[in-house]
Swiss-Prot record:
Residues where S-adenosyl-L-methionine binds: A32, G33, H34, D51, F78, D99, Q106
Entry's Gene Ontology cellular component terms: cytoplasm
Organism: Exiguobacterium sp. (strain ATCC BAA-1283 / AT1b)
Top enzyme class: transferase
Protein name, UniProt field: Ribosomal RNA small subunit methyltransferase H
HAMAP family the record matches: 16SrRNA_methyltr_H
UniProt-annotated stretches for the region Disordered: 290-310
Gene: rsmH
EC number: 2.1.1.199
Catalyzed reaction equations: cytidine(1402) in 16S rRNA + S-adenosyl-L-methionine = N(4)-methylcytidine(1402) in 16S rRNA + S-adenosyl-L-homocysteine + H(+)
Length: 310
């Protein structure tokens, strides 16, 4: 069963400022919680919903059946946002939503290899039509590359110890399953550190997932494209779940909400010198106490919202 608790649902819908006749894009369809809220607010408007996962798409089509005609499903990664919409004759939109949490069903489907809680082949591909998987990262990347991604993408302070342990183990035979990898991570991390801060494999698994799916580069490009696509007064809402994604979002929003250099002595700022984006949220919106109690995964969620000005 495809269960997925939607995070910051009403806050992000409010952030989009939906018009009944507007054009909206959900870049991360997942369990369709956000898409359902957008679709029910549309009359003559249209929602374009992206996901590269067949299971998520099948479930979402069922859930959004009451809104048939208002929703177009697109099986693609959001890095192809501009091209996919252009193929459908869409060049401007009124709102774009990103929810960067891996949907719980993908985490919980043992055979997908995302989770350190289930034994499964090392996989972690969001798009299963691609060949490159967690197996290739773990068994083929050099000690230096592994240590770098564990530290940079996972913020893992024992990155070198874990990379060294993997390098030693795979010299005997390939590392094939999630539990084999979990055991190596546990061996590499000193016992006192293993006992605090959640599951010892959490950061390493996050880093490998980001590397397999090239998540940070893909996200950076997609946010830039989404801002390009926005019509004047259109909104972009981004929900992130760790500091790396939030940093990218914050930086892109900051760059595109700054004034170009102004000629000295102007009494008023001419239209052409106004920044492209206006920040709706100076600080990110976080989950309420009630949501934190209902959904543990919301505790690291941050929502940022910006509006196109020109």
């Amino acid at each position: 069963m495809f269960e997925h608790e939607t995070v910051l649902k009403m806050e992000s819908i409010e952030g989009l400022n939906i018009k009944p006749d507007g054009v909206y894009v959900d870049c991360t369809l997942g369990g369709a919680g956000h898409s359902e809220e957008i679709a029910k607010r549309l009359t003559t408007g249209q929602l374009y919903a992206f996901d590269q996962d067949d299971v998520a798409l099948a479930h979402a089509k069922e859930r959004l059946a009451p809104y048939e005609g208002r929703v177009t499903f697109i099986k693609s990664n959001f890095v192809h946002l501009k091209e996919e919409l252009a193929q459908r004759g869409v060049t401007k939109v009124d709102g774009v939503l990103f929810d960067l949490g891996v949907s719980s069903p993908q985490l919980d489907e043992a055979e997908r290899g995302f989770s350190y809680n289930y034994d499964a082949p090392l996989d972690m591909r969001m798009d299963r039509s691609r060949d490159f998987s967690a197996y290739h990262v773990v068994n083929e990347w050099s000690f230096g590359e592994l240590a770098r991604i564990f530290f940079t993408y996972g913020e893992e302070k024992f990155s070198k110890q874990i990379a060294r342990k993997i390098e030693q183990a795979r010299a005997d035979k390939p590392i094939e399953t999630t539990f084999e990898l979990v055991d190596l991570i546990k061996e590499a991390i000193p016992a006192p550190a293993r006992r605090k801060g959640g599951h010892p494999a959490k950061r390493t698994f996050q880093a490998i997932r980001i590397a397999v799916n090239d998540e940070l580069n893909v996200f950076d490009r997609a946010v830039q494209d989404a801002i390009d696509l926005l019509a004047v007064n259109g909104r972009i809402c981004v929900i992130t779940f760790h500091s790396l994604e939030d940093r990218i979002c914050k930086q892109v929003f900051k760059e595109r909400s700054q004034h170009p250099p102004l000629p000295p002595g102007l009494p008023v700022i001419p239209k052409e010198f106004e920044p492209e984006l206006k920040l709706i949220t100076r600080k990110p919106i976080v989950a309420s106490e009630g949501e934190l109690e209902d959904n543990r995964r919301s505790r690291s969620a941050k929502l940022r919202v910006a509006e196109k000005q020109k």
